[in-house]
Swiss-Prot record:
Compartments, as annotated in UniProt: Plastid, Chloroplast stroma
The keyword Plastid belongs to this UniProt entry's keyword annotation: yes
Protein name, entry field: Protein IN CHLOROPLAST ATPASE BIOGENESIS, chloroplastic
Organelle targeting sequence: 1-35
Highest taxon above the source species: Eukaryota
Origin species: Arabidopsis thaliana
InterPro entries per UniProt: PAB
GO cellular component: chloroplast stroma
Gene name linked to the record: PAB
GO BP of this protein: chloroplast proton-transporting ATP synthase complex assembly
Function (record text): Involved in the assembly of the F(1) ATP synthase in chloroplast thylakoid membranes. Functions downstream of the CPN60 chaperones to promote assembly of the catalytically active core of the chloroplast ATP synthase. Assists the assembly of the ATP synthase gamma subunit into the active F(1) core downstream of CPN60-mediated folding, which is critical for the biogenesis of the chloroplast ATP synthase.
Record text on subunit structure and interactions: Interacts with ATPC1.
Keyword annotations: Chloroplast, Plastid, Transit peptide
């Protein structure tokens, strides 16, 4: 289908040295890390998700093993191909996206599930469709709460993806697969309707990927002006949420390097002074610079080189806990 692609799968904390002894690769280590280092409430069923991931063959890794990754990620597991599943700790979370499950890659993250519960639920449905039970047993009380075994078969819904979207939740890869299915059937109208639905602001807030995908759809059907507009909307989101290299989206948006140069100017001392001179609040300037630095690091793959500068911005914005979290590595 041309360029459309799928990838399945935004008070001062204690000194960081106080946390190291508490962090381990077990679920209690992840829970304490999220409470003490990430300074937020861990998902209720995180322990059960880790057990499920381990049971299906993934290696549970330390939440502090963030070297080379976007600093907002909390690693959970690594699969046999080296792909890392993580939680995303937003500095300021969009509504309904407090701690989504993501796949981490060089230039940022790809959204897997909006929350831990929906991810567990989906995994259990997909296992049940194969008439297996190992992951359900591993999920413990979370599985009993989230899914009743046999519900998929009893629903008489033939298509597993349709069941998950109706009964479990919305997942980016399933919506993208639905678009592909419509194109395979020659139904371009339904493909475009699904693509537009994917971009609804309350579905996956904070993520640019839906608009990238919609731009590809529009380009596929020859609506290049609308594709350009959709790509430009995508680039208003954090660039590390695009799900593909920045250059691919900038090409559809018909932008050269001017946007990158604009961002570089914004993070310079002169750019910060200019924003302050225009009356922007110092806290907002610091938050903007941190966001711009993350954008630039996602293009250049230089997360480690930007850590201190990003952390300093969050410190200046009064987000001391985020500053400590960003700097933390095992």
């Amino acid at each position: 289908m041309g360029s459309i692609s799928m990838h399945i799968t935004p008070s001062t904390a204690l000194p960081i040295r106080h946390f190291r002894a508490r962090v381990s690769c077990c679920s209690s280590g992840h829970v304490s890390f999220i409470k003490d280092v990430a300074a937020t409430e861990p998902p209720m069923h995180l322990h059960h998700l880790l057990k499920v991931l381990q049971t299906r063959g993934e290696t549970i890794i330390s939440p502090g093993a963030k070297q080379g990754l976007i600093p907002l990620a909390i690693p959970l597991s690594k699969n046999s191909s080296g792909s890392v599943t993580a939680l995303l700790r937003w500095p300021t979370a969009p509504p309904g996206m407090d701690m989504p499950v993501v796949e981490v890659w060089r230039s940022g993250v790809r959204l897997i599930a909006r929350n831990v519960d929906e991810y567990i639920h989906r995994i259990l449905v997909e296992e049940d469709a194969q008439e297996l039970t190992e992951l359900y047993r591993a999920s413990g009380e979370a599985g009993e709460k989230l899914y009743e075994k046999g519900a998929f078969a009893e629903s008489e819904i033939d298509n597993l993806d349709v069941y998950v979207l109706k009964k479990v939740g919305l997942f980016p890869d399933l919506l993208e697969r639905k678009v592909l299915r419509h194109f395979d059937e020659g139904d371009h109208v339904s493909a475009m309707v699904t693509g537009e639905f994917y971009t609804k602001k309350d579905l996956f807030p904070g993520f640019g990927r839906p608009f990238v995908y919609y731009a590809n759809i529009l380009q596929k059907v020859g609506r290049n002006v609308e594709a350009k507009d959709a790509a430009r909307v995508a680039l208003r989101s954090p660039w590390w949420t695009l799900g593909c290299p920045y250059e691919e989206v900038a090409s559809i948006a018909q932008w050269e390097d001017e946007q990158i140069e604009f961002i570089r100017e914004k993070v310079s001392d002169e750019g910060r002074f200019e924003d302050l001179h225009k009356g922007k609040a110092p806290i907002q300037v610091a938050l903007d610079v941190a966001a711009f630095l993350l954008d630039l690091a996602s293009i250049e793959g230089t997360w480690s080189e930007s850590l201190n500068h990003i952390a300093k911005c969050y410190e200046e914005a009064g987000l001391h806990h985020i500053s400590n979290f960003v700097l933390y590595t095992d």
